[in-house]
């Protein structure tokens, strides 16, 4: 016999005759011990605890200065199969952190039913970032904005008619607490001190743009802590103009701003209040988002790179929003208000990494910069290869299921109700009634209100299309006999994701009236049909074979075959308005008006062989066919509405008008408030800019408020621009309505070759008692447009604009 002493007190005894077995055992044992050693060391490397904290003028990681260079990505806007590719792209760009929102409404689509699996697995996303050596900043809301449906809040909150969102409303806060606990279960174990990679967690989101309510923000902070986020710094973000409104003493304060901003000016007030705090721009906007019916947005690469250089040279941390925007798949796009404007499905954002994950000029310019700010001894990894791209030959649709021939179960209601009251979150809703009496020609059908795009039918004949974006809530009727079937089909285009308008119920929100002269009659007794956008609802319709393209709302079905898969862009340019599903995946919205004409189709959702595609077109296509392109089309507008707010031949006449107030603005950034000596009543508010601060012709305004009798800003919900003497639309969307779009980084700007004076007339929608106004100049550094001298005119009736050319 032979005794082999393998480990201190562990003996294996083998009979010599079995030496071959022994040798085999030793070989396997060696392999096992080697793999165990490697695995143990790998696991230890992945779970090593660290400490992240705020130090004097810098963040500290394990006691050493650390500059956060974060890339904002959204797991919801990237197919799960591509998560790691996009994270690797960010690392190759020079980032050390990934910043993410948590989208409440995608995890709790039905009250009480949470989903953190698959595409929604936020813990897996964070672990993927850690796998590639990236830290994570978590922004759990509950409100996130992000150009996302209702700012991330679940639609079913609106079933409670008196709910006050983003306040201490008891039901709202109860649901926020439940949601935060679920997020904590997923992510609190991944805090950096526990061996994970989460280094910071945000409390609420840009609340200063919503209101002043420190008790509410404090309550959200407490819920975040109670959910388990107690071991990493908590922070709150806002704009430099309003961050003090709700600033809590025990949170880190950060500010958000865009490319071209004056860095020193943005942090000036924060440094005065907290001279030793680490500075961070928690959203440095690399580009901007697109709206249906408006030009594709871009921002100069050089301005973005220069802004980041300015921050790094000052030891300021940043998160680049967006580093990769991706795609708002399905129905999840949000909207702005006022004026209502829905977001496109593409969230390309003109970011350094394109919608499809490609490198851009911005990517390489920024990568070249960030190479200079690496820790000693580090180099950037190679840029990952782009994913395969394919073309798909044109294929046609011959199977059609008319929507009116595929009605779901009917529901009855005496009075009009929005879709939430029928337990519907998204999609379209059909309201049907019969006219109780003959309707005379010229009678007005008034809908209060259309949310968001409606088609009106009488006995199946299309009478009108009404668009909330344009304030279209009425139509003139022809003669209609008693008993005529009146159908109003309303599509929900995306709930508002910013400001108080997030209480955005869909369908018809209040009532429908017939108005003739001074008489009005509210229509009652409605039959309602709900059309959600779930694949389970739309997949099994009664399709007919036809080569005739209908002009009525319909579902279309086809298949296409592939020899190989890859990313592509579905060309929807011959279609009207609706949504697309491929192999059960909701791809997004299309609308002929543009600017987006293609839908990004990830190759990971395609398959070799036969693929199924379904299209819902509420308007009807010109040609029912689709092909896959190798490049997107994001900048083709077909909107026929005028871009600017001055009709041909108009020229504002002010010579005989009474000046309500005159003065001069002080130079520099930041809000300026002006109070009038006396109260003035009026509906039409005119600002005339008389001279610039610098030697240029340009006038520019970022935001504008009119102060009411209580000294507070009046509602801008229904404001319209009646007149602007000049608006720059060649280099960007610089139209006058930007002064009340609630975004400080967008602005009205006049054309550079049009001299002063410049005039702007706002229709306040009703007579207001005006006590003054607030004005925010354009925020960018060393850019023109600062106004010096001005005059104010206020009238109850509209101004004289001369003869309009028809």
Feature roles, as predicted:
Residues 260-354, 358:
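Catalytic-core region of carbohydrate-active enzymes that cleave or remodel glycosidic bonds
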Residues 647-655, 664-720, 725-806:
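Aromatic, loop-rich ligand-recognition surfaces of beta-strand-rich domains
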Residues 112-118, 142-166, 217, 221, ...:
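Aromatic- and acidic-residue-enriched segments that line the glycan-binding/catalytic groove
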Residues 45-97:
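N-terminal carbohydrate-binding accessory modules
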Residues 488-493, 615-621, 688-695:
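Short beta-strand-plus-loop segments that form exposed binding edges in beta-rich domains
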